[in-house]
Amino acid sequence: EVRLATTKSEIRRAQRLRYRVFYEEMSAVPTGMAALKRRDVDAYDAICDHLLVIDHAAVNTTPFATKPFRRARPKVVGTYRLLRQEAADSHFGFYTAGEYDIAPMMAANPGARFLELGRSCVLKPYRTKRTVELLWAGIWAYVQHHRIDAMLGCASLEGTDPDRLALPLSFLHHHARAAEGWCARALPKRYVAMDRLAREAVDPKAALQALPPLIKGYLRVGATFGDGAVVDHQFGTTDVFVVLPVSAIAERYRDH
């Protein structure tokens, strides 16, 4: 099942899943509070909607679920954080603005309603096309309900050495660069060049194999990518800017 979290308890379960994936499985460095609570939490959680994929056939096996008199709950196996422009504007802006200069893109598209996608993760055994399709179906329903014109966000490649990621970064730079008016540039202090290999040195097939499933999914749907990558040392990742105007979404994905 895919739906929005409706209670604080469900948001906490999404935060626990994020902690498991980002901190325990990958190499993110938790703050003391995150390590204590075993949840990935930040100020944006309070102003975002949280999309959940729930497996009703599986139940939580955490100590919390085995307390006397507490009902066993279906397992949250995937999540996405959704931030609408009106919520961002009335609080502290988009999370992405901490890595990319998105103001020129916003100015080039006056009146467009933007939705930021972030903090996406899926529990390891569920990293299948089916789960990605469920998340996409949930996002697409949300986009239609709120009349969103374009989606934006940061997508991550694992690792903090851009030279080891030269092939996928160069592929995105040469073959999937956002058009003028939709292309955000990494902030000057954080800018890492993506064109580490010449266009003719990029083997597209090998590059696609080196990309994480989420970025491959974005490419399939019709997303394009910004100018420059950003190294996020806390999360142990190299981030790229992704943008997807609704008008650019491949027709076959609109029918979900």
Where are these regions (language model features)?
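A short beta-loop-alpha structural element at the N-terminal edge
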Residues: 2-14
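Helix-loop element at the rim of GNAT/NAT acetyltransferase active sites that forms part
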Residues: 17-31
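Short Pro/Gly-enriched beta-strand edge/turn motifs at strand-loop
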Residues: 31-36, 224-226
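Catalytic micro-motifs at enzyme active sites that drive phosphoryl/nucleotidyl and oxygen chemistry
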Residues: 36-42, 67-69, 102-107, 228-229
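A short catalytic or substrate-binding loop motif that flags glycine-/basic-rich loops and adjacent residues
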Residues: 42-47, 234-236
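Short, His- and charge-rich active-site/binding loops that engage polyanionic ligands
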Residues: 47-106
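Acyl-donor binding region in acyl/amide transferases
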Residues: 84-224, 229-238
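C-terminal "cap" of GNAT-fold acetyltransferases
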Residues: 236-249
